[in-house]
């Protein structure tokens, strides 16, 4: 038991450092998540945890940091089984996540965040958050903030779950503040004869690139290209009338390498700069330049961008910039649910989804609203690893991890969906029922029953007949007398045995709490189950996650009307 005591003290210290004071319930939940084999000894654990919590709450911060440092070291060793990075030197690795603020981040963005973050921390390096905001037509200020909020929650969870600290980015960069610098680099390419302004229609450009045929603009004098470039910058061209192209090789086997466009005119207000700029770099130019200029040593991206690696390396070399490692990882898809914002946005705009935080979709805020703990997402992607193989995710895999996190800490409540009234013959009110707050706790919650009738779920009567026996949780055994469409007649059983009797949840009729349970099914459908719960439902805080007995884990979404969202069973 000595190693368990040591673990309890470490977890209590970690909790105290994070929240200012250690909490017994939180520490118990964490240790049961890490050591599920200890569930059977929970009664012995509780006094040990209470003692540890009292002790660490009296310790100075320096002592707590010493204890927690050991915990993080152990967790960090666990993560080291990830493959080594090529050409990586400890203390000098710089990685980044580079989201475009054009929507709310999804589960797919979580992988793009966590893979480079984990590697940066494993190598005691630096991690950057860089907003790729050079397409103003689809970018909004609200998306910058959403990305900051959701990414912050995941990185904090990464520190808690994997011991990788600090659980935040080291520097934030906004690409659009570097546009003038990128204009100078573009001019440098033109002056070196490595780029030219093309005014061919977009369809003609696509056709010629496919066939490997250059256009007349390719051989324009440098002076002409500089003149046209200034005209682009000064508003002389409308959107689509001109773009700056990189001069490469029109016969290159990779079509992406055939004189790609690197700057274009976009006539849209930028969320930060308004109408100050109208010429913006394409992704290949901005990502290659910014990765080099900001010191990135290892740039991770989804392997869908692999055909663009040649272009990006060419840009870096043409400008004489510092080169870096480009590493691809596999994409993820979610079984039966679209991840792409181009699929989700129309569903939001049409009203099919109530917003980007709709619990039916795998946006990060949708998952959090559904009751998925950020630690579950971190653990899932850690187990998945940085593989280059594409993966199809079944949400049950994440639910399984989430269940292990919630089960030790979520209090149990009774909720009766689709209720039917049941009268109990032989029950003399008032009666005080005692129900478990949690299977691993001695605590009980009292429910006062002032009448001889309760609500039970209509589904619990399926297949039953008069004479069959049930047990109302924490109350009494009953025998079915009769079943009608709108009412059931029960009587108190002569024998009050527990074993071998089906135990069901119930709610008082007089003081039961009306509640709704939102059950996500697909991006296009859901079920809203109405019902009644025990009186204690009134005390649940908004955002709190509980377990409805025999129903599943649920998060309180709003208080008026009392509405829960089903996380999973």
Curated annotation (Swiss-Prot):
Its EC number is 6.1.1.17. It is found in: Cytoplasm. It catalyses: tRNA(Glu) + L-glutamate + ATP = L-glutamyl-tRNA(Glu) + AMP + diphosphate. The lineage of its organism: Archaea, Thermoproteota, Candidatus Korarchaeia, Candidatus Korarchaeales, Candidatus Korarchaeaceae. SUPFAM superfamilies: Nucleotidylyl transferase, Ribosomal protein L25-like. It comes from the Archaea. Pfam families: tRNA-synt_1c (PF00749), tRNA-synt_1c_C (PF03950), tRNA-synt_1c_C2 (PF20974). Its main location: cytoplasm. Signal peptide: none annotated. It comes from Korarchaeum cryptofilum (strain OPF8). GO terms for biological process: glutamyl-tRNA aminoacylation. Catalyzes the attachment of glutamate to tRNA(Glu) in a two-step reaction: glutamate is first activated by ATP to form Glu-AMP and then transferred to the acceptor end of tRNA(Glu). NCBIfam families: gltX_arch (TIGR00463), PRK04156.1 (NF003169). This is Glutamate--tRNA ligase. Keywords: Aminoacyl-tRNA synthetase, ATP-binding, Cytoplasm, Ligase, Nucleotide-binding, Protein biosynthesis. GO terms for cellular component: cytosol; protein-containing complex. Belongs to the class-I aminoacyl-tRNA synthetase family. Glutamate--tRNA ligase type 2 subfamily. GO terms for molecular function: ATP binding; glutamate-tRNA ligase activity. A motif ('HIGH' region) lies at residues 99-109.
């Amino acid at each position: 038991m000595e190693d368990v005591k040591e673990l309890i003290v470490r977890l209590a210290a970690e909790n105290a450092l994070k929240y200012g004071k250690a909490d017994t319930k939180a520490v118990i939940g964490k240790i049961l998540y890490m050591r599920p084999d200890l569930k059977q000894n929970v009664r012995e654990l509780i006094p040990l945890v209470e003692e540890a919590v009292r002790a660490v709450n009296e310790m100075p911060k320096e002592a707590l940091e010493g204890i927690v440092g050991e915990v993080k070291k152990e967790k960090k060793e666990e993560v080291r089984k990830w493959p080594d990075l090529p050409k990586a030197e400890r203390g000098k690795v710089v990685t980044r996540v580079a989201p475009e603020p054009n929507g709310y981040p999804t589960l797919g963005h979580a992988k793009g965040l966590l893979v480079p973050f984990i590697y940066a921390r494993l190598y005691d390096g630096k991690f950057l958050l860089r907003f790729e905001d050079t397409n103003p037509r689809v970018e909004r200020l609200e998306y910058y903030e959403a990305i900051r909020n959701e990414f912050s929650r995941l990185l904090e969870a990464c520190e808690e779950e994997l011991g990788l600290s600090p659980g935040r980015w080291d520097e934030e960069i906004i690409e659009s503040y570097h546009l003038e610098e990128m204009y100078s680099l573009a001019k440098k390419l033109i002056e070196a004869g490595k780029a030219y302004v093309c005014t061919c229609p977009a369809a003609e450009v696509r056709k010629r690139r496919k066939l490997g045929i250059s256009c007349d603009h390719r051989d324009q004098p440098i002076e002409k290209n500089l003149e046209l470039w200034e005209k682009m910058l000064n508003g002389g061209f409308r959107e689509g009338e001109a773009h700056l192209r990189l001069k490469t090789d029109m016969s290159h086997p990779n079509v992406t390498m055939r004189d790609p466009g690197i700057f274009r005119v976009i006539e849209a207000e930028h969320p930060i700069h308004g109408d100050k700029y109208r010429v913006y770099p394409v992704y290949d130019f901005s990502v290659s330049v910014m990765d080099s200029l900001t010191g990135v040593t290892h740039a991770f991206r989804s392997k869908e961008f692999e055909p663009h690696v040649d272009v990006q390396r060419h840009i870096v070399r043409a400008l004489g910039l510092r080169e870096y490692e480009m590493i691809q990882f596999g994409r993820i898809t979610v079984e039966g649910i679209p991840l792409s914002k181009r699929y989700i946005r129309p569903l939001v705009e049409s009203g099919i989804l109530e917003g980007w935080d709709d619990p039916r979709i795998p946006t990060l805020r949708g998952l959090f609203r559904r009751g998925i703990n950020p630690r579950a997402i971190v653990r899932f992607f850690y187990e998945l690893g940085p593989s280059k193989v594409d993966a199809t995710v079944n949400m049950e895999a994440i639910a399984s991890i989430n269940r292990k996190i919630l089960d030790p800490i979520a209090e149990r409540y009774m909720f009766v969906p689709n209720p039917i009234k049941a009268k109990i013959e032989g029950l003399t009110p008032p009666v005080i029922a005692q129900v478990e707050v949690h299977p691993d706790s001695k605590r009980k919650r009292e429910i006062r029953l002032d009448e001889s009738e309760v609500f039970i779920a209509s589904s619990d009567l399926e297949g039953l007949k008069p004479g069959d026996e049930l047990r109302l949780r924490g109350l009494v055994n009953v025998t079915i007398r009769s079943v009608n469409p709108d009412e059931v007649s029960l009587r108190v059983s002569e024998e009050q045995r527990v074993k071998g009797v089906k135990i069901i949840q119930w709610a008082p009729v007089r003081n039961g709490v009306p509640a709704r349970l939102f059950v996500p099914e697909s991006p296009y459908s859901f079920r809203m189950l109405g019902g009644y719960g025990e009186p204690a439902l009134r005390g649940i805080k908004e955002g709190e996650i509980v377990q409805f007995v025999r129903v599943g884990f649920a998060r309180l979404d709003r208080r008026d009307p009392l509405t829960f969202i089903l996380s999973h069973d």
